[in-house]
């Protein structure tokens, strides 16, 4: 304002120029600024100083068609369809599911909506998600063939966002979160899971539910750079004791075990041991992000889980039909 805007407003030579000449001088400057803004976005990885500049590592996008990917011999999967349905955590698996499709010859059908989970194991899904859930199930019922596989992905852990981790005791917060899974909520979660699984089992498809993944008090993308080190939003840190996560997911794991015993079509896939050490789970491991934010996988995290997920699909497809 003081060094550019005000001097330009009072510059006598400019005031004496015809408006057309001023416009002719301004247009190249506007074009230059626009080109600079475009280049900043288009070449973010080259010009950014942030450790998050590598979109391939951080973003959970569909695997690029131009990027080479070694095929895998999995004839039992070739031609089958993989239906992926759920909330934003279903979308966060896109790197992994697109890679497994290219490697094995599967066809992926994706339906996701943020905040609308399938079988979240915590409570009933929100009322405004029922239309999406019914639409997704109807699509699967209409298009799936016996032997196809359905991945139901969701946030199945109580969220750790929004707490003041500097002032509040972590164990008290964890106890508060566990208390939110009241008997009524637990029963509603079970009822919804049974309704969904019963409908899918009648189709002759196989169902995969991902067990509750790690989650964190701060988001890796926001809190990995040195200049955010003192941001209050990053105070919770990018690691969690594994014992705390096991405690937070214990009720959901117990329900999953009961559902798996009740529905032979259900397979529980648990990525947590692949993402955590014996004592600690970290959002960033050896400089590589496993998670993008508090609870969504990164592109690198997807690639870490790919071999396990692919083998799970092969094992399912190799079993005798139900």
Predicted segments, located by residue:
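Extracellular/periplasmic envelope-modification machinery, especially enzymes
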Residues: 2, 6-322
């Amino acid at each position: 304002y003081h060094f550019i805007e005000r001097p330009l407003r009072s510059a006598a030579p400019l005031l004496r120029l015809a408006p057309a000449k001023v416009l002719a001088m301004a247009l190249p400057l506007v074009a230059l600024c626009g080109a600079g803004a475009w280049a900043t976005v288009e070449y973010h990885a080259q010009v950014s100083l942030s450790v998050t500049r590598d979109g391939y590592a951080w973003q959970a996008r569909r695997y690029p068609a131009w990027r080479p990917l070694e095929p895998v011999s999995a004839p039992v999967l070739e031609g089958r369809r993989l239906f992926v349905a759920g909330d934003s955590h279903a979308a966060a698996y896109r790197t992994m599911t697109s890679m497994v499709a290219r490697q094995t010859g599967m066809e992926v059908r994706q339906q996701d909506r943020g905040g609308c989970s399938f079988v979240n194991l915590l409570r009933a899904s929100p009322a405004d998600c029922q239309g999406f859930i019914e639409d997704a199930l109807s699509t699967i019922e209409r298009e799936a063939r016996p032997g196809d596989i359905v991945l139901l992905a969701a946030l199945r852990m109580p969220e750790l966002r929004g707490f003041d981790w500097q002032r509040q005791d972590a164990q008290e917060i964890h106890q508060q979160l566990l208390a939110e899974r009241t008997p009524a909520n637990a029963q509603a979660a079970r009822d919804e899971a049974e309704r969904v699984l019963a409908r899918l089992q009648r189709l002759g498809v196989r169902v995969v539910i991902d067990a509750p993944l790690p989650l964190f008090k701060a988001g890796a993308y926001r809190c990995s750079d040195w200049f955010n080190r003192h941001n209050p939003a990053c105070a919770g840190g990018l690691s969690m004791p594994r014992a705390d996560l096991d405690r937070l997911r214990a009720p959901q794991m117990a329900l999953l075990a009961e559902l798996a015993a009740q529905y032979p079509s259900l397979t529980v896939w648990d990525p947590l041991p692949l993402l955590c050490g014996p004592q600690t789970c970290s959002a960033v491991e050896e400089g590589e992000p496993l998670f993008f934010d508090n609870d969504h996988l990164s592109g690198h995290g997807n690639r870490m889980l790919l071999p396990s997920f692919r083998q799970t699909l092969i094992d399912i497809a190799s079993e005798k039909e139900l």
